[in-house]
Amino acid sequence: FVLEEALKNDISLETSSAFDIDIVKNLYDNGKIDKNIEVVCNGFKTDDYLNKISDLINNGFENIIPILDNYRELDKLTESIDATFDIGIRIASEEEPKFEFYTSRLGIGYKDIIPYYSQKIAEHPNARLKMLHFFINTGIKDTSYYWNELFKCLRVYARLKKIAPEVDSLNIGGGFPIKSSLQFDYDYEYMVGEIVYQIKKFCEEEGVEEPN
């Protein structure tokens, strides 16, 4: 029900597991979406998840974007997809030392992305790099740590954009905090505006087009 209401607006979808792909197929079978909808496929990808992503692309879904969490995933997708397809790369953030759950094993390191693109993606016959995925596990907060990681991401984007003009999207993950007490005070509008402003300003200074 929630998805059906959301789909009345111009939205994209995001998946994080093989089960979510089944939901996408069900929405299509019931006429709730068409094959042009953008679906960003995040999360660690089991073979089942990768196979279901490949099935969507092979069956004519035109805007499926699997986000690579590791080097293996592109090899698996290449083996099972018969058409051209878009991909994204998750940037492995350098996490705060005190964070309880270590998740930066997911993604490709800042320093490795340009070499990986040059060696594996630039001349790939079918894959096209479209998106960078920037995820901070502590969420979107007005802290020096958050802004520092965002600017690292933007430096990678700017360098990539100069050699890979097809890269045109930035997916910002981590989520906003939610109200958990009466004292909760978070300026959502300020943070959204500041993130967009900093991205636009950085790209103007670097002489590259800002991302979607």
Predicted segments, located by residue:
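Alpha-helix-loop-beta-strand connector modules within alpha/beta enzyme cores
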Residues: C153, M191-E204
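Glycine-rich beta-strand-to-loop/alpha-helix junction loops that act as flexible
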Residues: N137, L170-K179
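Active-site-proximal beta-alpha core segment in soluble small-molecule metabolic enzymes
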Residues: F1-S169, Q198
